[in-house]
């Protein structure tokens, strides 16, 4: 294989069909393995699941000292997304920009393997229908988009890496509580009620436990789009990882490592903790002058969550779609038709002028 040749991945790890020997892949609509040739179905065995949390501090100490397992990953030369290369795919393209991945981009990295996965529950055909309905419902979209510029060939199922963090907080704070009251000012026609706030100094403590603070391990995803469809991903509604669930899909390798993910989770918790302090202060308004937070019992898990990714080109720009692989919820970027917007403005102006003359004559 030349260094510039598109990757052809070995399919020997695919589960062989007991009927014809062909490769079997996971089909979300059946929640089972289905043979690509004869259609035979093999149920995926699911044992009792006990979610295991890892102590963050002790794990980081051992991770920095010991030599952890490495895995082969491939990095896209265009958008720099990374994916593991042990998927049961015949060829591979970047799930985010569709750039072909080549052999020279494969390298080995230390890798904390994910332990749990939320399997795809929405299949490819359902997603194609969801995409077409979404596109048809777009206001002021160019006609070319409405007629179906989207190609199902660009639809890719990706398991996205996530970290979940648990932590206990204990926060001492100083601030002020504001209690509103009203006074009457002025006289005669100028008499009115004005709102005033009486401030008093307060201090206290709050303690909270935060469970499964979710942090994406991807730096390639567009976070504004991802956040809008993340509802429906339950970090506890997962299964122990099995190759069967990953068969036929791309598994992205995390770019946000465990420590960076923890820092992001801590920032998220700090926002929650500030709101907790405000609730504890009470009153109508609050001022928080100082917060001193201690963290304890920090644990984590590494999980995979399902996402469909697609895009289409219009003009000189690429537009991206994301579909939640569990709920089917969709979000995406879209173009606007300048002439449709201009025509709508013109019609609105005509109606406005007509109404002005109508009421003027009346």
Where would I find each of the regions flagged by the language model?
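Juxtamembrane boundary at the C-terminal end of a transmembrane helix
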Residues: 353-362
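Short, non-ligating residues that shape and space the ligands of small metal-coordination modules
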Residues: 24-27, 44-45, 85-86, 103-104
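Cys/His-rich metal-chelating microdomains
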Residues: 21-23, 41, 81-82, 100
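Short metal-binding segments enriched for Cys and/or His
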Residues: 42-55, 64, 102-112
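Extended, hydrophilic extramembrane loops/domains of integral membrane proteins
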Residues: 305-331
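Short cysteine-rich clusters marking metal-coordination/redox-active sites
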Residues: 17-20, 35-38, 76-79, 94-97
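Residues immediately within or flanking Cys/His clusters that coordinate Zn2+
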Residues: 12-14, 32, 69-73, 91
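Charged, low-complexity helical/coil segments in non-catalytic cytosolic or luminal regions
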Residues: 68, 112-313
């Amino acid at each position: 294989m030349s260094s510039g040749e598109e990757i052809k991945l070995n399919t020997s790890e695919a589960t062989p069909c007991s009927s014809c020997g062909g490769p079997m892949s996971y089909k979300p609509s059946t929640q089972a393995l289905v043979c690509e040739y004869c259609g035979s179905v093999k149920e995926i065995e699911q044992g009792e699941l006990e979610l295991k949390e890892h102590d963050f501090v002790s794990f980081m100490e051992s991770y920095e000292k010991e030599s952890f397992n490495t895995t082969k990953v491939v990095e896209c030369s265009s958008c720099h997304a990374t994916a593991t290369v042990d998927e049961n795919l015949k060829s591979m393209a970047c799930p985010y920009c569709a750039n072909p991945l080549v052999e020279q981009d494969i390298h080995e990295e230390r890798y904390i393997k994910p332990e749990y996965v939320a399997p795809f529950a929405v299949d490819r055909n359902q997603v194609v229908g969801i995409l077409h309905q979404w596109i048809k419902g777009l206001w002021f979209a160019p006609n070319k988009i409405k007629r179906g510029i989207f190609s199902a060939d660009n639809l890719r199922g990706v398991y996205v890496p996530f970290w979940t963090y648990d932590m206990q907080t204990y926060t001492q704070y100083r601030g002020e509580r504001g209690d509103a009251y009203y006074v009457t000012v002025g006289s005669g026609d100028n008499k009115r009620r004005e709102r005033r706030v009486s401030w008093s100094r307060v201090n206290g403590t709050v303690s909270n436990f935060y469970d499964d603070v979710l942090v994406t391990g991807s730096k390639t995803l567009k976070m504004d789009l991802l956040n809008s469809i993340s509802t429906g991903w339950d970090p506890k509604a997962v299964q122990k990882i099995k190759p069967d669930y990953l068969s036929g899909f791309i598994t992205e390798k995390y770019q946000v490592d465990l420590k960076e993910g923890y820092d992001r989770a801590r920032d998220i918790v700090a926002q929650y903790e500030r709101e907790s302090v405000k609730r504890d202060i009470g009153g109508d308004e609050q001022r928080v002058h100082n917060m001193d937070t201690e963290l304890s019992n920090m644990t984590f898990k590494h999980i995979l969550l399902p996402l469909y990714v697609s895009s289409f080109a219009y003009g000189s720009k690429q537009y991206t779609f994301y579909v939640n692989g569990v709920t089917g919820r969709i979000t995406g970027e879209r173009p606007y038709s300048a002439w449709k917007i201009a025509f709508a403005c013109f019609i609105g102006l005509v109606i406005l002028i007509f109404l002005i003359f109508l009421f003027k004559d009346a």
